[in-house]
Amino acid sequence: MAIAWGNTVTPAFRQKVVDICLKLGADPDHLMACMAFESGKTFSPSIRNAAGSGAVGLIQFMPATAQALGTTTDKLAAMSAIKQLDYVELYFRSRAGKLKTLEDLYMAILWPAAVGKPLDYVLFAKNDPKYPKRYLQNAGLDFNKDGVITKAEAADKVR
């Protein structure tokens, strides 16, 4: 089966992605695009966030997320990519049926509160007095440099 980024992974990986997406009601192309973006196009289960957040792997699992899934980022990093896909599925399972678009699938990774929201939903704002750091950490997603990062802007980077 041909899927986005399929030539960069093994046939077994591709098939597992397709199987996961059937269970989740998601498009395999969308999941592959998100994992390509999050892993710096490596699809490496051990790739770590360069900014030092502690995130690791195919969808950049944060330490607290790994713990909630019953593991650690070190254990995730030591897994094969195919084994880590079990945790990718587990992570998305609670949102099964709600990940119909690339934008919503990516929001489930970046900012889960935005799943199901309109494309102009504001994720981060430069002038947010309560959480200004959120914008700064994601400023690269503000394509039009207006000080606001919308759901659509964030997902454009994944396309």
What are these regions (language model features)?
Residues 142, 146:
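Acidic carboxylate motifs that coordinate Ca2+ or other divalent cations, activating on Asp/Glu
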Residues 2-139:
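Catalytic glycan-binding domains that act on GlcNAc-containing polysaccharides
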Residues 148, 152-154:
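A recognition module on extended beta-rich or small alphabeta surfaces enriched in W/G with H and D/E
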Residues 1-5, 156-159:
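N-terminal secretory targeting signals
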